[in-house]
């Protein structure tokens, strides 16, 4: 079977929230008011004083975590612990932080990921690979290039495929330029050695 035509593929306007590397990022669906509404609920719930002074979440547990940059509370998952510090992953934005125990709170089950799905959409540039952002100059340059491509502005994403919940996308800017192709042309990304394009519409 031939791959389906581009015009039949799902498209969405995305606003990026976190760049992992030059081909991997997290985003929100543009103009989705549910993120702000959820954040209000989380802020109100997590600001309450900690009733149990011995609270100490384990790796893999979800919780409230107070982000170092803006001191606001967000839903998070504990990734790891080293001595008195916890590395957390923010479920609704895709970024990470290292915080101390006093910046963690239990998460109300009604706000947990089982009740309300994480709002950060994990995406990869379809069929492309990059050096890790912290691995040599090429990886850092690729991450900066993806970040500079209309950061903070909605960008059209054409969904080429899905892989274990991750969207494989082609990004198109306002000038209808193909960001994926531009990053490859600049030598910042390379095409994966092997991949199989979907030959049926995404459901």
What are these regions (language model features)?
Residues 1-203:
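Intrinsically disordered, low-complexity segments and flexible domain linkers enriched for serine/proline
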């Amino acid at each position: 079977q031939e791959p389906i035509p581009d015009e039949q593929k799902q498209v969405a306007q995305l606003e990026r929230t976190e760049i992992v590397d030059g081909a991997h990022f997290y985003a929100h669906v543009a103009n989705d008011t549910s993120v702000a509404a959820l954040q209000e609920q989380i802020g109100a719930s997590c600001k309450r004083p900690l009733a149990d002074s011995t609270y100490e979440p384990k790796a893999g547990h979800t919780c409230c975590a107070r982000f170092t940059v803006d001191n606001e509370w967000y839903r998070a998952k504990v990734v790891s612990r080293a001595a008195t510090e916890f590395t957390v992953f923010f479920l609704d934005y895709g970024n990470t932080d290292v915080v101390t125990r006093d910046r963690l709170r239990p998460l109300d089950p009604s706000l947990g990921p089982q009740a309300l799905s994480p709002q950060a959409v994990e995406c990869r540039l379809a069929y492309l690979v990059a050096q890790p952002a912290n691995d040599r100059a090429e990886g850092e340059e690729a991450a900066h290039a993806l970040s500079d491509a209309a950061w903070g502005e909605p960008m059209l994403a054409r969904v080429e495929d899905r892989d274990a919940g991750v969207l494989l996308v082609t990004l198109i800017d306002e000038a209808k330029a193909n960001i994926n192709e531009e990053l490859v042309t600049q030598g910042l990304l390379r095409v994966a050695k092997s991949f199989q394009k979907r030959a049926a519409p995404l459901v």
